[in-house]
UniProtKB/Swiss-Prot annotation:
Its cofactor is Mg(2+); Mn(2+). This is DNA primase small subunit PriS. One of its GO terms (molecular function) is metal ion binding. The lineage of its organism: Archaea, Methanobacteriati, Methanobacteriota, Methanomada group, Methanococci. The gene is priS. One of its GO terms (biological process) is DNA replication, synthesis of primer.
Length: 363
């Protein structure tokens, strides 16, 4: 690749593919998310970097969509916060926060079963991301907060993760106030307490709450740790101290493993002006779609990121290439490619480009 991307054949081809995608996503399928209350939302984007620019805003949907069609960014974002002055530079204080969406970002790393490089993806690490979403929803959001599938928006990020937005229906209320209005007015410290509770950072073994108590008792039973006395008391510290050294060690190890099950990006909950990927865009590192899915499709394992996350039209456009470095295999829509592949679809070409792989397009 030359120093000037505009002179590079691969960069120009990738740019053309992104333009084709956005034209289809906006004009044909209406896939691209237009953030609610657009004039009060900050927009950001990236081309060769994850974020090249932010502090942008648009007054109308038409103006926004025209800009996306013209620029066709590789990474596209919107702010979780609604702001009085979203285009002002200088942080939350100057932007004038009105309210903020509440969302979780699960971003997994390679697992012990993965055989690839840290930056690559496969069924194993994507499966781990799925499992973590289900833990978050089924162990906390459903039982603790009385939410249902209709109260959540689940989005595949286009890489090894998911965004889970809390969008309680209007019927969910605290007193006379709608639950959605309540949580979107949370201050930073309230959001911080929320995520720390889910991560077990507030866990007090001398005064165990019922949710964490039930979760840990379930895990103790899996490890054949006697739970009768734990079920009858909230002072677990005293009970743990009565156990033999090896049992005590196993109990603390089990608690530690359970607390570390979720790879949540805490900054997404903490940061007042956090940006998240726009639904219906492409992920610039993988070329996969940032796609909203249902809880039921995730639960039943019907959603396959390496199949349903691929823009189908890009799997039919083929290129002759020379891949100049050794790389791990990747399977997209059932087809496996690696550094020995000489004919590849646009879907794989975007993945190679996003990962900075050295390759050339042949005539």
């Amino acid at each position: 690749m030359t120093d000037n991307p505009a002179d590079n054949k691969v960069f120009n081809e990738v740019s053309s593919l992104y333009k084709q995608y956005f034209d289809y996503a906006i004009n044909v399928r209406k896939w691209l998310e237009i953030p609610d209350d657009l004039p009060h939302r900050e927009i950001g984007y990236g081309m060769l970097k994850k974020v090249d620019n932010r502090n942008m805003s648009f007054n109308t949907n038409g103006e926004y969509l025209a800009w996306v069609l013209k620029e066709s960014p590789f990474h596209l974002y919107k702010s979780l916060s609604y702001m009085e002055y979203p285009d002002v530079v200088g942080g939350a204080a100057k932007k004038g926060l009105i309210k903020r969406e509440v969302a979780f970002d699960i971003d997994t790393h390679k697992t012990e079963k993965c055989t690839h490089d840290d930056s690559w993806i496969c069924e194993e690490c994507l499966g781990e991301a799925r499992n973590q979403v289900l833990i978050l929803i089924e162990d906390f959001l459903f039982p603790d907060f009385g939410l249902s599938e209709k109260d959540l928006k689940i989005v595949f990020t286009g890489n090894r993760g998911y965004h889970i937005y809390l969008k309680p229906e209007d019927t969910k209320k605290i007193g006379d106030t709608k639950l959605l209005e309540k949580i979107e007015k949370w201050e930073k410290n309230e959001r911080r307490y929320f995520i720390e509770y889910i991560l077990g950072k507030n866990l007090n073994l001398r005064n165990m709450g019922s949710r964490w108590k039930n979760i840990l008792i379930r895990e103790f039973k899996k490890n054949k740790i006697s739970t009768k006395k734990f079920e009858k008391t909230s002072d677990w510290k005293t009970e743990i101290d009565t156990r033999k050294d090896n049992v005590r060690r196993e109990i603390y190890e089990t608690i530690g493993k359970v607390k570390s099950r979720l790879e949540l990006d805490e900054k997404v909950m903490d940061d007042d002006i956090r940006l998240l990927r726009t639904i219906g865009s492409l992920h610039g590192y993988t070329g996969l779609m940032v796609k909203e899915i249902t809880y039921s499709s995730l639960k039943s394992n019907q959603f396959d990121p390496l199949n349903h996350g691929v823009f189908s039209k890009f799997h039919k456009i083929m290129y002759n290439v020379n891949i100049k470095q050794e790389i791990d295999p990747l399977t997209l829509k059932g087809d496996t490619f690696d550094h020995k592949s000489t004919e590849i679809p646009a879907s794989y070409l975007l993945f190679l480009f996003g990962h900075g792989i050295d390759f050339e397009i042949l005539e």
